[in-house]
């Protein structure tokens, strides 16, 4: 008999808990948007308008894919976090490959 983990099952977070986490992130000073996407670029949750959400999800998913490849090629372990400093603020990206999700926080 295989354990649930061995068969590829993942512990799923409830929608209620996810919304509580997102609300807590959004309440932080300077946060202007939070997006959760899967590794294929499909938005799972967002507090941004639909067009911006889809744009962020697609672009960040592509960037994370490139970053994962770079880290693997450089033999630097595994990617845990990316920060992009921009003229408008900061984009914090936390990919979780084992769970198949990417958390994106846009800050002023």
Q: What is each residue range found by the language model?
A:
Residues 1-108:
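Non-catalytic interaction/Regulatory regions outside core domains
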């Amino acid at each position: 008999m295989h354990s649930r983990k061995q068969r590829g099952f993942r512990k799923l977070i409830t929608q209620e808990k996810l919304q509580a986490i997102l609300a807590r992130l959004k309440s932080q000073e300077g946060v202007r948007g939070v997006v959760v996407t899967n590794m294929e670029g499909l938005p799972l949750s967002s507090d941004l308008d639909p067009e911006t959400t889809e744009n962020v999800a697609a672009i960040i998913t592509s960037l994370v894919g490139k970053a994962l490849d770079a880290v693997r090629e450089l033999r630097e372990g595994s990617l845990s976090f990316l920060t992009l400093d921009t003229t408008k603020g900061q984009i914090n990206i936390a990919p979780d490959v084992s769970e198949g999700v990417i958390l994106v926080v846009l800050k002023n």
